[in-house]
Amino acid sequence: MPTPVESHSLLHSGLTLCGSIISVNQDRRKTSTLGCVIQVGSGFYGLTAAHAVRKSRAYPTLPLNSHTDEGLGAASDGPMTSHVLRNWQNPFMACKNAEAVELDDHSTSEVAVDESVEDVDFVTDVEYEDLREDDDNHGDDSTTSMPNDVFHEDYLTSAPQEGMMETQAMFLSIPELNDKCLVSRRARPNMAHRVTHGDSGSIVIDARTNVVYGHVVASNPLGEIYISPIGATLEQIQSHFPGSKVSLPDPLTILTGLATFGHETIGRKRARYPDKLRNLGLSPDTEYTRLVTPTANKSLDFSNYPKFHYFHQCSEDSSSNRRVNEVEKSQPANLTLDCNTVELGLRQSTWHQADSPVPLSSVKEESGLGKLARSPAEPAPSRPLPGSSIPVVISQSTGRELYSNGVTEATLSSKLSDEAEADTSIKPDSDAASPTDCRIIGHLRTRPVGLERDLSSTYNAALSMDQDPEELLQQDIFPMRVWRSLSTLKQRLPSQERLENLTWRMTHINLRKPKEQEEPKRHRTSNNSIVGSSDIADVGKTSKQKAIQPNIVELDVVTSPENIPLPASLVPISSSEATWQVDKKSVSSVTFGQSSGCFPPSYQGFRPDAPEKGNLPRATTTSYHLPPQPIGWPTCIPSNMKWHSLVNMSTLAADEHEGEGRADTNRHVSTQSNMPTEQSLLPQGDESVPPTCTNCFTLTCDILARNENVDQLAIDAPGHITSAKAVYNLYTFISYLLIF
């Protein structure tokens, strides 16, 4: 029987032995190449050159250095065989000159080949006792050497060769056959080395169409090879097997047979598993397949739905109470539940992937059939499955056990009918998990415990709004967040005093002004400053104009000497010159709409322009215009904060006899632009008598004084702030300015 002798060729042919070098009885001097596999009946056989594997005959001994035509002609059978290449004496010397090869004493390629033939099999019987390697008294004469010093002769390669083929028929006589054979084609390969000993039997195919022409039978000294046609070879084999079909094998039939054989082999091995488990003392669980047809009531047609396969696992010792376990986590993540067949099991599963198309004609939409149940750790309202509805219950929880208690298919169908008529009022949740994470429960009769409870309780809790809006207002934590943010922010600002009053006014919740102080009493004091009639008229006219036509107040570096001053509690800017000089780098130019001419005292470093129409200089800027917006603010401002307001000075006309001296004094004070002291603005005397501003001739009043009928500040001066909303807008703008 021919056997492969070259491991290199086997290494490059993982799926087939075609192209491997074979020999008879491990005789490396008579080798050939396994061309292809043919099918004779139901058996498969390898095809190669017959003269290479036929039983050899004894040939006369030839000297190693005799490589002449006379020596080769001694084995010739006729004049037609003089051009046939025969280097059969030593396969290691093929296409080489023996005299040109020099071997070292330690070379592994040195092989002593005795050309004298003692028997037909070229095998010399050696007694076991004569072997030196088994003699303990004889030392090993081999010397060590580096692996790269060893000379390896290239021999018997299985790489494919390319060339051109001539369609010319001829007869060729081979010495070993003693007859002539038909050779239909002759090919001339394009390779560095010509065909050597052992290449007989190599298959020749077309490089473009993969058509098999035949196999190599001989070669000549010119490097040309002779091919035996495959058709003639199959006809010769058919003559020896009249009742069998001889042809090249069909790959599809072979693969189908291999798959069937593998399936049967695996089935036999799995059938022996229970016996092996019993031998180990274990109780195996039998596995079988059960088909369930998803049918509901008569109004629903599920004839187009295929059958669902799932594995039912039961224990041998509990036949009456069988358990159906859910599928483990070995399922793929891209599983989709549609109308294709789904097989559920612990080890063998066939899943429909997400990219497989589903015909719309075989799908009937029915809402409320498929339901999605979330795990208890993440409760959420369920939603119907997208696409085609499947009458099965879906669960994402693992480790849950369901009991069947002998349910028949009729009971299962009635249960599915109830599922089809279930309540569909549950709203779909767009944030719910995708159904690709779900698993089909093997048993559909028993619903998962707590499914309805989890869904209803979660949904009702999401929609419950029993709290009163007033309670929500009381629980509002926005002011506290503002308080914390501003408290941490003012620790980083260079001027922390600017935010102290602002944060207290914006974030305090519980302080309110008592009702008895809603409308403050305004009285004139005997020591009020008296101005001239011209000044009184100008002040009255200006206040009326501001009440009728609110203008845009510009806050910038103020140069007017008669502007309204700021409270002295905030660091005053004192100057002995005639004008106010403020560092322009420390403030920002801002313009905002406001219907009042009064500004909060916490706005340090800014002074509004004088309301008079005189030729006093005004500060003009290109700033942001921020009109006030009506934003409600429920909190109150501390009552101990005072704000000065203009007084109707027209009632002071009768006091002209005292006005001359007072006016001169006041003009002198205003031109000098002296900042009022804290005692003059916020006196510590009687609270019922509002103090008077010595700089702008105004009376201070409580800013939190509210009227009972309207939600406005109880300030009669028409040119001042008239709503708490405007105050909040002003404070919000100041906070943004200080932060940014």
From Swiss-Prot:
For this UniProt record, the keywords arranged alphabetically read as follows: Virulence
One Pfam assignment: GATA_AreA
Task: Give the start-end ranges of region Disordered.
Answer: 353-391, 414-434, 514-535, 656-686
Which residue ranges have biased composition labelled Polar residues? Answer: 668-682
The pathway noted for it is: Mycotoxin biosynthesis
Q: Where is the composition biased (Basic and acidic residues)?
A: 656-667
Function text: Part of the gene cluster that mediates the biosynthesis of gramillins A and B, bicyclic lipopeptides that induce cell death in maize leaves but not in wheat leaves. The nonribosomal peptide synthetase GRA1 incorporates respectively a glutamic adic (Glu), a leucine (Leu), a serine (Ser), a hydroxyglutamine (HOGln), a 2-amino decanoic acid, and 2 cysteins (CysB and CysA). The biosynthesis of 2-amino decanoic acid incorporated in gramillins could be initiated by a fatty acid synthase composed of the alpha and beta subunits FGSG_00036 and FGSG_11656.
Protein name as it appears in the record: Gramillins biosynthetic cluster protein FGSG_11657
Query: Organism source for this protein?
Result: Gibberella zeae (strain ATCC MYA-4620 / CBS 123657 / FGSC 9075 / NRRL 31084 / PH-1)
